[in-house]
Amino acid sequence: MNINVNIKNIIIDKPLKLDCGQTINNYSLAYETYGSLNENKDNAILIFHALTGDQFVSGINPITKKEGWWSYAVGSGKAIDTDKYFVICANVIGGCMGSYGPSEINPDTNKKYGTTFPVITINDMVNAQFNLLNFFNIEKLFAVMGGSMGGMQTLQFVNNFPDKAKVAIPIACTASHSAQNIAFNELGRQSIMADANWENGDYSNQNKNPNKGLSVARMAAHITYLSKNGLQEKFGRKLQERDDLKFGFDADFQIESYLRYQGSVFVDRFDANSYLYITRAMDYFDLVKEHHGNLSKAFEKTKTKFLIISFTSDWLYPTSENKEIVIALNAIGAEVGFVEIESDKGHDSFLLKVPKFLNTLGDYIKTAYSKN
C-alpha cells in the first residue's frame, strides 16, 4: 500500500509526553479537510475516526480508491454539510495512513519501528490532534464528534480541553472499555502474533506480512460490528454458490464467504502492528478510572453541549453504556441530549445509510450552529 500519494500532513515539533512515559518530537500527523473555514473561524468540525478508519471521511480515498468511510454523512448537502462547515479529520498516531506509527521509519535505526514503537493511548491521540487547532489558527471548534473509538476521542477531547468545543457528539461509544471488548481485541491481537510472518513485529523490515493473522482478526472483529438479527436477515443459512453442503472446510455458507472477503480486503489497507497498537489504546481507555470512579468529573469544567447517540442493536457499545455518559453529564447539570436510534445493523449503524440517524445528526448540527 503506497501511502505517499496525496497525503496532507504536518510535522509537529512541539514535544508530546506520552502516557507510557516516552516523549516524541517532530512527528507526523496526516489529515484531510472538507469545505472552507469561514472568516469568523467558527464553523470548524473535528471528526475523530474509529479503529480501522482514517482521515478520508468523504469523497474518494486516494489510497484505496474507495469512498470515504463516512461519505453517507459528510459532504455537500449532507448531515455534516461541507457547504456550511469546515471538516477536519486526522489519522491517529499509531495509525497507518501517514501519521506517526509503527510502520514509520525510526530515524535512529533507519528501520521501521515495528513493536519498538511506543504504546499510545486515546489521550495521546487526542493531544496530538489538538495541534490541528493551532495549525489552522482556530481558537474554538464548533463541534467535535466521532463514532466508536472516535466517540472515545470525543469524550477525551472535552475532558482535556473543556473550553475548546461548543458541541460534542459521541456516537455508539463508551467511557470505559469493557472486559468483553478487551477480550475481543485480545483475540485479534493473538491472531496476528500467532502468524509466523509477524516476526515479533519486525515483519516490514523482513519484507513479510502477517496477512493471515490480520485477516482472522478482522473477521472476528467484524462479527461484533453486526447484529444477530441483521446477520440472520441478510445471510441466514444460505449456501454460497452451491446447491448442497460439500462436507469439507470450504465456505459452504454465505456468511463464511462474507467474513473471508472482509478479512482478505482488509489486509490491503491496514497494518498489523497498527491494529495491535490501536486496539491496545482502546483497551486502556477508562475515563471512569481516570477520575477515581466519578465520570462526572471528566466534564465538570466544560460548557460544551452534548448529543449522545446509540443504536438499539449495538451489543459492542450498548445503549446502557452510552446512558452512563448521559447520567454523568446530567449529574453536573450539563446540557445533554440523548437519542437511541432503532436499527438492526448493529454497531456499524453509524457508518451505514440509516436515515433516522443521519436526519437526527443533521438536524442537531444545524440547530446548534444556528445558535452559535
Swiss-Prot record:
<feature type="active site">
    <location>
        <position position="314"/>
    </location>
</feature>
<dbReference type="GO" id="GO:0005737">
    <property type="term" value="C:cytoplasm"/>
</dbReference>
<comment type="similarity">
    <text>Belongs to the AB hydrolase superfamily. MetX family.</text>
</comment>
<dbReference type="InterPro" id="IPR000073">
    <property type="entry name" value="AB_hydrolase_1"/>
</dbReference>
<dbReference type="GO" id="GO:0004414">
    <property type="term" value="F:homoserine O-acetyltransferase activity"/>
</dbReference>
<keyword id="KW-0028">Amino-acid biosynthesis</keyword>
<feature type="binding site">
    <location>
        <position position="218"/>
    </location>
    <ligand>
        <name>substrate</name>
    </ligand>
</feature>
<keyword id="KW-0963">Cytoplasm</keyword>
<feature type="binding site">
    <location>
        <position position="348"/>
    </location>
    <ligand>
        <name>substrate</name>
    </ligand>
</feature>
<keyword id="KW-0012">Acyltransferase</keyword>
<feature type="active site" description="Nucleophile">
    <location>
        <position position="148"/>
    </location>
</feature>
<dbReference type="Pfam" id="PF00561">
    <property type="entry name" value="Abhydrolase_1"/>
</dbReference>
<feature type="active site">
    <location>
        <position position="347"/>
    </location>
</feature>
<dbReference type="InterPro" id="IPR029058">
    <property type="entry name" value="AB_hydrolase_fold"/>
</dbReference>
<dbReference type="GO" id="GO:0009086">
    <property type="term" value="P:methionine biosynthetic process"/>
</dbReference>
<protein>
    <recommendedName>
        <fullName>Homoserine O-acetyltransferase</fullName>
        <ecNumber>2.3.1.31</ecNumber>
    </recommendedName>
</protein>
<feature type="domain" description="AB hydrolase-1">
    <location>
        <begin position="43"/>
        <end position="353"/>
    </location>
</feature>
<keyword id="KW-0486">Methionine biosynthesis</keyword>
<comment type="function">
    <text>Transfers an acetyl group from acetyl-CoA to L-homoserine, forming acetyl-L-homoserine.</text>
</comment>
<dbReference type="InterPro" id="IPR008220">
    <property type="entry name" value="HAT_MetX-like"/>
</dbReference>
<comment type="subunit">
    <text>Homodimer.</text>
</comment>
<comment type="pathway">
    <text>Amino-acid biosynthesis; L-methionine biosynthesis via de novo pathway; O-acetyl-L-homoserine from L-homoserine: step 1/1.</text>
</comment>
<dbReference type="GO" id="GO:0009092">
    <property type="term" value="P:homoserine metabolic process"/>
</dbReference>
<keyword id="KW-0808">Transferase</keyword>
